[in-house]
Amino acid sequence: SCANRLLLLPNGYNEDIFYPEEVDRESLFDSLGLPYRGEYIVLFAGKLAEFKGVDTLLRVAHRYERLTEREIVTLIAGDGEEREKLSDLHKLLGLRHTFFLGNQKQDELWRLYNAADVFVMPSRREPFGLVALEAMACGLPVVGSNEGGLPEFINSSVGTLVSSNDEDAFCGAILEELAHSREAPERRAFVARYARENFAQELFVTKLEDVYASVLS
C-alpha cells in the first residue's frame, strides 16, 4: 500500500551557522542595549503568533520572577501579529526582567543560543520546531510543549517536554534546567553532539539522496 511506502525525513539544521561556541554574555547584552549582571538567561525565538504560546511564557516568567531568588532574565526574539497584545500582557504582569528583542538575524540568534541557559518553546501547535533544533545545535537544552513535531527530537537527555497549558510544569522544568545549567558543561556538549549526529543538514541531504536513489533504481 501507499502508506507502507511513506518515509518521513526530519528537517535538518545548517551546521555551518549553528554550532556551540563560548559567547561573552556581557558583550552580547551590551549590543542589545541591556545591562547584564550575571543572570541566568531563558530564551524564546520565533514568530509572535497565538499558536507559539508566548503568552504562556510571560505568565511563567511572572512566576519565576516572583518565586525564586535566582536572578533570571527572559529574552524573546521575534515579531508578529501578537506583539501588541503580548506587550500589554507584559505590562499587566509587571515583568521587570523580560525583554522583547524583535527580529534577529541568524548570526545574532547564534549568539543568543550560545549565551542562554535554556530555550523555551511553549507552542500550542508546532509542525516541527526547527528553532528548537538550532538551539540544541548550539548546546542549549530545551523545555518545550509535548505537541506536534517537538517529541520527534526532544527527549529527557536533551530537554523536557510538558503539556502546553501546564504553567506550573513549565516553571518547574525551567527552574530545574537552570539549577544545573552552568555547573555541567558536559550537558551542553552532549546536546550539541546529539543534534549534530542526528539532525545536521548534511545528514538530511544524504538521506534524501538515498531515497531518490532507491526510487530510481
Locate the predicted segments by residue.
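Aromatic "clamp/platform" in nucleotide-sugar-dependent glycosyltransferases that forms part
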Residues: R124
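Conserved donor-binding/catalytic core segment of Leloir-type glycosyltransferases
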Residues: Y36-K52, L58-A61
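Nucleotide-activated donor-binding/catalytic signature segment of Leloir-type glycosyltransferases, i.e.
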Residues: S87-Q104
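Short hydrophobic beta-strand element within catalytic cores of glycosyltransferases
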Residues: P141-G144
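Short alpha-helical donor nucleotide-sugar binding micro-motif in glycosyltransferases
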Residues: N103-Q104, R111-A116
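A short, well-ordered alpha-helix in the C-terminal region of glycosyltransferases
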Residues: E183-N198, D210
